[in-house]
Amino acid sequence: MQGLVEFVLSNFIFTLINLWIMYWVLKKFLFKPTTEYMEGRKKSIADSIQEAEMKNKEADESKAQYDMKLQDIKKERSQIIDEATKRAEKRGDEIIKAAEDEAEKVIERAMTEIQREKQKSLNEMKNEISQLAIAAATKVIEKDLDEGTHHKMIQQFIDEVGETKWQN
C-alpha cells in the first residue's frame, strides 16, 4: 500500500472534464431555468409593487378629490343655511312690517270712527239742545212762532256761542 491517495494525472484530467461537463449540464438544464424563473419572479414582484404603488397613488388622488368635494359641499351647505337664515329673517321683518302697517291702519280707522261718532254725538246734542231751547223759548214767550223761525234762531245762537264749547 503505497499511499492511500495517489496523484494520477489522467484521473485528474478526467475529473476536470467530468466537472466541466457536469457544470455545463447543470448550467444548461438547472441554473439557466432557475435563473430565468428567479428573474421572472423578480420582475413579477417588481411589477406587483409598481402596480400597488400606482393604486396607492390613485387612491391618494381620489381621497384628495373626495376631500375637496367634501369641503365644497360643506361650504355650499353653509351658504344654503346662511341664505335660508337671511330669507327667514327678511320674511320675519316683512311680516312684522306688514303687522305694524295693519296696526296703523286699524288705529287710523278707529280714530276716524271715533271722530265720526264724536261728530254724530255733537250733532245729536245740538239737535236736542235746539229742541229744548225751542221748548223753553215757547214757554217763555208763550207765543208759538213757526218752527222754521225757531230753528233758525237756535241754530244762529248755537253757531255763535256754542261752537267753541263743542270743540273742546
UniProtKB/Swiss-Prot annotation:
Record carries keyword Transmembrane: yes
Annotated localization: Cell membrane
Domain of life: Bacteria
Gene3D superfamilies linked to this entry: 6.10.250.1580
Record's keyword terms, sorted: ATP synthesis, Cell membrane, CF(0), Hydrogen ion transport, Ion transport, Membrane, Transmembrane, Transmembrane helix, Transport
One family name in Pfam for this protein: ATP-synt_B
GO cellular component: plasma membrane; proton-transporting ATP synthase complex
TM regions (residue ranges): 7-26
Gene field: atpF
NCBIfam families xref list: ATP_synt_b
Described function: F(1)F(0) ATP synthase produces ATP from ADP in the presence of a proton or sodium gradient. F-type ATPases consist of two structural domains, F(1) containing the extramembraneous catalytic core and F(0) containing the membrane proton channel, linked together by a central stalk and a peripheral stalk. During catalysis, ATP synthesis in the catalytic domain of F(1) is coupled via a rotary mechanism of the central stalk subunits to proton translocation.
Molecular function, one GO term: proton-transporting ATPase activity, rotational mechanism
Protein name per its UniProtKB record: ATP synthase subunit b
Family as reported in the entry's similarity comment: Belongs to the ATPase B chain family.
Major subcellular location class: membrane
Subunit and partners: F-type ATPases have 2 components, F(1) - the catalytic core - and F(0) - the membrane proton channel. F(1) has five subunits: alpha(3), beta(3), gamma(1), delta(1), epsilon(1). F(0) has three main subunits: a(1), b(2) and c(10-14). The alpha and beta chains form an alternating ring which encloses part of the gamma chain. F(1) is attached to F(0) by a central stalk formed by the gamma and epsilon chains, while a peripheral stalk is formed by the delta and b chains.
Membrane topology classification: Single-pass membrane protein
